[in-house]
Amino acid sequence: MDIQKVVFVNKQLNTRMAGLLRLPEGFNLSENYPAVVVTGPMLSVKEQAQSVYAERLTAAGFVTLVFDGTYFGESEGMPRQQELPDVKESDIEGAVDFLASLPYVDAERIGGLGICGSGSYMSVAGVKESRLKAITAIVPAIADISKSAMTGFFRPENEVRAAKEAYEQGRGELTYLNFMPRAFDEGAAYYYSSRGTHPRWSNQVVAWSQLELVKYNVVNIMREMTKPYLVITGENAWSREASTEVFDAVPHSNKEMHVIPEASHFDMYDLAPFVSEAFEFIIPFFKKSL
C-alpha cells in the first residue's frame, strides 16, 4: 500500500489540514475506487487509532484519508487543542471535498468511519453531509454530553466563561482541561504506552471547548439519519450505553449494531483480536453500501 502525505483545506475556516492518504496495493490511476474518511478519538492525531482502521480498509481495496483536525497535530488553527464539534464536522466536510476531487475516487462511493468521540461526530456528518453514503461508528462515545460522565472533566461554567473572556481581551492565559488523566487506567494503558502515544498528542484541551461540547446532543440529530449505518461497540466498553442510545435514535431499519465480546472501549482502538472481529462486519458493510 502507498501512503502519501497530503494537504487539503477546511473551506469554512480556511485552515490547511495535514492528512495521510492511503492507496490500495496494485493501485491503478485509471480506476474509480470507493473511499472512506477515517477519524479518531477526541484530541487524537492522525497516526493513532484512525490509522489502524485506515490501514485495514485500504488493504481491503478502499482509498482512505486520515487527518489531524483543525487545532491539532500538523494542521493549522489557533489556539491549539480546541475540541469543538462544529469544527470537527467542517473538518470532515473538507476531507470529503478532497477525496471527491481525486480523479480515481468515485464521488458517489465515499463513506465515513469514526472512533470514540468522532464516532459521534462522523455519525452527525452522515446526517448533514450528503456526499457521505454510509457511516460506521466504532464505540461512539457521545450521545448527550450534558448527561455523561465526561462532565466530570469540566470546570464550573462561570469560571470557564470568565477565563475565555480574559484571554480574548488579552488579560489572561489559556486554561485547559485534562481529558485523559493517568489515573484512568484503561485510557492510560493506550495513550501512555507504545500502543497509542505520539509526540504530537496531548491530553490537554482548551477549557472553553466544554461550552460547546455540553450542548452537543447527538441523539436528537440522529433521528434524521437516512444512510446505511453500522455501530460497533465492546461488551465491556464504558461508552456502550451512549453507543446504544445513538444507534436506537436512527429511525430506519438499514442499520446494524454489533457487540464485540470481552472488548473494552480502548481495546477497540487497536488490539488485534477485537479490531479483527470488528472488520468481519466493517468490510462487508462498506462493500455493500458503497
Mark where each language-model region is.
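N-terminal cap/lid segment of alpha/beta-hydrolase-fold proteins
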Residues: 1-31
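The serine-hydrolase catalytic nucleophile loop
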Residues: 43-55, 69, 242-243
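Conserved alpha/beta-hydrolase
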Residues: 56-76
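Alpha/beta-hydrolase active-site loop
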Residues: 82-103
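Alpha/beta-hydrolase fold nucleophile elbow
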Residues: 104-116
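Alpha/beta-hydrolase-fold enzymes
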Residues: 123-194
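Short beta-strand/loop motif that positions the catalytic acidic residue
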Residues: 225, 231-233
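Catalytic histidine-centered segment of alpha/beta-hydrolase-like enzymes
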Residues: 263-276
